Amino acid sequence: MNPIAAKQPRGMKKSSKMSRAFLLKLELRSHPTLLCVIRGALEPLMEMLGFSDEYNRAIIRAVDEAVSNIMRHSYHGRLDQPIEVYCNRLQRRTNGETEKGVEILLFDCGAAVDTTKLPARPLDEIKPGGLGLHIIRGSMDTVEYKRAGRLNRLRLVKYARSSKGGCGSAEGEPS
């Protein structure tokens, strides 16, 4: 039995924005060599949704960084812990226009994250590490973390017409 989720991730409320069937569901272990599996699955999905190459790269970079953070900080480097990734198509109306996007949900059962200790470090500080949150927040329109019981949930959202992250173009809108 899957330790994180059965059919619907625990702690996730059903909303009108989400259908019961996800476009993509991945279950993997917290081994860094599996990051390429996530990247390999997301790239054609983002292309299928019609995201431009720039958006595609930004989304994959953010998810890759988020999953790396789960492996390093939530699971403290343990290589056999479960991580689940769910992707779903989104749509919203803004200024009379329909914007299409993607929602990516990441679930793990690792240590809770103290969000008060997560401010991104100043970019002018020259030292390795600490840019992960900056990359994630700069690439995505919405970044939401929630702890529900023993489950961590990270919700990442990107819309095609977003100016955040400097990615994409009008022709890169999902169809």
Q: Where is each model-derived feature located?
A:
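Conserved short strand/loop->alpha-helix "switch" segment adjacent to the catalytic nucleotide/phosphoryl-transfer site
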Residues: 40-64, 125-127
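Conserved beta-strand-loop-beta-strand hairpin that lines the nucleotide-binding pocket
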Residues: 2-25, 71-175
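STAS-typified acidic loop motif
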Residues: 23-37
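Heptad-repeat coiled-coil signal-transmission/dimerization helices
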Residues: 35, 39-42, 136
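Structural signature of the histidine kinase catalytic ATP-binding subdomain
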Residues: 30, 51-54, 78
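Hydrophobic residues in the alpha-helical elements that line and stabilize the ATP-binding pocket
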Residues: 66, 70
